[in-house]
Amino acid sequence: MIVVKVLLFSEGKNTFSRSGVGQALNHQVEALGANNVEFTLNPDEDYDIVHINTLGIKSWRVLKKAKKKKKPVIYHTHTTYEDFKGSVKGSNQLAPIIRFWAKKSYNGADYLISPTEYTKNLITEKYLNKEKEIRVISNGVNIEKIKKDEELKKNFLKKHKINKPLIITAGLPFERKGIKDFVKIVERCSDYQFLWFGSSSIKSMLPKKIQKIIENPPKNLIFPGYVEKEELIGAFGAAKLFLFMTYEENEGIVVLEALSAKLPLVVRDIPVYENWLQDGINCFKARNNDEFYKKMVSIVNEKVENINEIIENGYKIAKERDLKKIGAKYKEYYEYILENKNI
C-alpha cells in the first residue's frame, strides 16, 4: 500500500466557502479523513501529490511549484466558461477569461477529475489540447448528516411561520440557477410558500435585476440567505419537494443533499443529469416553466402513484455517492497516479 499525503488547494477559501467549489473542498476533507488519507491545506508543507480546485494566479503558482518538484498535479474541473456565465455582474464579459484560465490550468495538470460524465466530455471536447486522463468522481454527500429530523422540522416551521405547502431550493442566487423562472413559478402559486437558500452576502455582486428580486420578492417567497446545516435539514423535513431550475451545472451538491433527505426532486432536463437522473424513476424532470409547474402541483397534491419508489431510487443515487465511498475513489486514484508516476 502506498502512503499518500495530498495537498488540497483552493484559493480564496474564505471568500468562496459557501460556493459549490467551497463545499467541494469541505467534502474532500471529509472524504479523505474517512479513508485515513493524510492531507494538508498548506502549500508550504511537504506533500506527494497536489489536488487543485480553483482557477487563479495562486493556483497556477502552486501548479508550477509542484511541477518543478516533480510532484503530480491533479486539477478538479469544477469551473467552466459554461457555468460561469449568468452568475455575478459582468460574468458574461469575464467568461472568456475564465475559459482561458481553465484551458491553461487543465492542460497544465498531469491528471484531471470531473464530477460527472457530462463535465468530463465538456472538458475533453472544448478545453484540452491533447488527450489527458480524466477520472469521474462525484463531489459526494454525507448521507448520515442529511437525515430528516422531526424536531428540526418543527423548529424550522415555527421560525419561518410556515402554514402552506413548502417548496424549497438552494444555491447562489444567479440567473444561471434559474432564479427568474423560479420567481415566475412563485407568482403563479400564491397558495404555496417558497424558500431559496443561498448566501445573501454576495448580493452587491449580482446584476441589478437579480438584486431587485432579492430585495422585493413576491410575498410567498423568502430568501433566508445562508443557513447552518441543521436549519437546512429542518427545511428538507418540512418541504414537499426540492425545485432545481438551474440551466447549467457540473453536478450540484444540493441535488445530492435533496436525494439524501428523501425529498422529491424536480430538476431541469439538462445534459448534466442525463443517464444517472431519470425522469419518473429517481427524480422528476422538466424542460420549461409549464412542466415544472405541472410536476410540482402533482407532487404537492399527492397525485404521483409511485412517489415512494421514486424517492427510494433517488436515495440510492445519493448512497452511491456517500463521502466514504468518494474518499475511497480519491485514494485509489492517488495511489494509481503515484504508482504510474512519470512526471
State where each predicted segment sits.
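Glycosyltransferase donor-sugar binding loop
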Residues: 141, 170, 193-209
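Conserved acidic donor-binding segment of nucleotide-sugar-dependent glycosyltransferases
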Residues: 279-290, 298-304
